[in-house]
Amino acid sequence: MGKNVVVLGTQWGDEGKGKVVDLLTERAKYVVRYQGGHNAGHTLVINGEKTVLHLIPSGILRENVISIIGNGVVLAPDALMKEMTELEARGVPVRERLLLSEACPLILPYHVALDNAREKARGAKAIGTTGRGIGPAYEDKVARRGLRVSDLFNKETFAIKLKEIVEYHNFQLVHYYKEAAVDYQKVLDDVLAIADILTAMVVDVSELLDNARKQGELIMFEGAQGTLLDIDHGTYPYVTSSNTTAGGVATGSGLGPRYVDYVLGIVKAYSTRVGAGPFPTELNDETGEFLRKQGNEYGATTGRSRRTGWLDIVAVRRAVQINSLSGFCMTKLDVLDGLKEVKLCVGYRMPDGREVDTTPLAAEGWEGIEPIYETMPGWSETTFGVKEHSKLPQAALNYIQRVEELTGVPIDIISTGPDRDETMILRDPFDA
């Protein structure tokens, strides 16, 4: 039997999943996206050349890998075509390597218009979405009115369904939000112009994955965002609109849940967050700015500067529980180089003085929380590009070991730079 490995984020996204997926796909036959949309921003650096993917799985640059967009992903046709065109201009034969589920919900211009209208209306209480229509598209899916890739096979029926839903959403846009209506004919023309390209890539993903598993193929599932942005388990309402956790693999791809063999949690050596929402270890000082600059913490999708802070072990332990993590990959260890001391958040002090070591479930429960820190010596030596575990500074090794002790999960991979080969694989997930 084959082995199925899940790669997902353990924090608020931006942990470095894309690089790790790209690295590990050297052995994989399939790479599957199972949730989210083009709100993801997965950055790959190969031989110094940077590639940012938003919708297409990170395995697309490997000629031996088939990339799959599963049913749990909301798919923006225009965004997919843009990404395909850019990759094809660089010589990547995307259409030979990419497959789609016919059950993918479509993100269309009225979703984007609604997303931005709602954020504008929220004012100071805005969630901080990427403004790309992700939430409204999932909303249509759950309400059973959304259009899917499968609808593109019958263009006449698609046109009728589209007209109904455009009228439905335009009423809200114009009369409630006082925004401009979406042009039905333009949306229809734009989608139909590329419909045949999309339908040509459609397969029965569940059937394909089950057959691949039986044939002993190695399959990797690529998560987007992070555990603490999960619609059910994250810092609600400051979350995304999909299940970013390991449970989303089965529902978002059609793989049977018993067939997940290893779950790799990507954990950044410190914490970051984009947009609004709780962030107990946030640093609004020189150290926070140091982390932002050294880590180049600016969103691959939005360009927004990320909030930065110390590694929150309490939050990461929640990710361990929810995802039943098999191991960690620690990324951006090199960003901590040069700090005299480093801190780990090992508990929270509540407003009433109680000390706890678990995360609240709703955003309101995080208000007034103070982090309880464990302080460790930093290191002056560089870890950037180090490829042997034994050559890391002792203080860095101590930091890694302490994270393992506090979480109960081994760190199987360590990333010391953005390039594919600036990585130490201590235990390969496909062999674990």
UniProtKB/Swiss-Prot annotation:
Binding annotation for GTP: 13-19, 41-43, 306, 332-334, 415-417
Catalytic residues of the enzyme: D14, H42
Catalytic activity as recorded in UniProt: IMP + L-aspartate + GTP = N(6)-(1,2-dicarboxyethyl)-AMP + GDP + phosphate + 2 H(+)
Domain of life: Bacteria
Role this protein plays: Plays an important role in the de novo pathway of purine nucleotide biosynthesis. Catalyzes the first committed step in the biosynthesis of AMP from IMP.
Family designation: Belongs to the adenylosuccinate synthetase family.
The name this protein goes by in its record: Adenylosuccinate synthetase
